Curated annotation (Swiss-Prot):
Protein keywords: Ribonucleoprotein, Ribosomal protein, RNA-binding, rRNA-binding
Bias kind Acidic residues: ranges: 120-134
Taxonomic lineage of the native organism: Bacteria, Pseudomonadati, Pseudomonadota, Gammaproteobacteria, Moraxellales
Name assigned to this protein: Small ribosomal subunit protein bS6
GN (gene name): rpsF
Presence of keyword Aminoacyl-tRNA synthetase: no
Length: 134
């Protein structure tokens, strides 16, 4: 079995159905003795260029290990699903399990924002404590 990295660009109106779509594709891979090594939902992002007059879309990345027949079936499902604007399948030498650069940067942003909000809450508590002393 070979390793593949799959990126899907889904129509923004279908963002609610992304979870169901991805679950269906993962089930297909697992039913055919494949494995899913990584799954990342990148969310709604700006496209580099408009596709069919659409400027934003929902991105999903997953790394799988499957045979050729399963991959062909997946690609056919991608092709005939109107919600999928574009799909990209790249063969990889090894399974990739660590988070992508995009996911790492998103985690770092969340980590930087968390202390700020905690400081803001502490500042408000300090102000309320100052008022109670008077």
């Amino acid at each position: 079995m070979r390793h593949y990295e799959v990126v899907l660009i889904v129509h923004p109106d279908q963002s609610d159905q992304v979870v169901g779509m991805v679950e269906r594709y993962i089930k297909l891979v697992q039913d055919n003795n494949g494995m899913v090594h990584r799954l990342e939902d990148w969310g709604r992002r700006q496209l580099a260029y408009p596709i069919n007059k659409i400027h934003k879309a929902h991105y999903v990345l997953f790394n799988i290990e499957c045979d050729g027949a399963t991959l062909e079936e997946l690609e056919e499902l991608f092709r005939y699903n109107d919600a999928i604007i574009r799909s990209l399948v790249v063969r990889r030498d090894d399974a990739i399990t660590e988070p992508s650069q995009l996911a790492k940067s998103a985690d770092e942003k969340r980590a930087r924002k968390a202390p700020r909000s905690e400081n803001f809450d502490n500042d408000q508590d300090d102000e309320s404590n100052d008022d109670s002393d008077e």
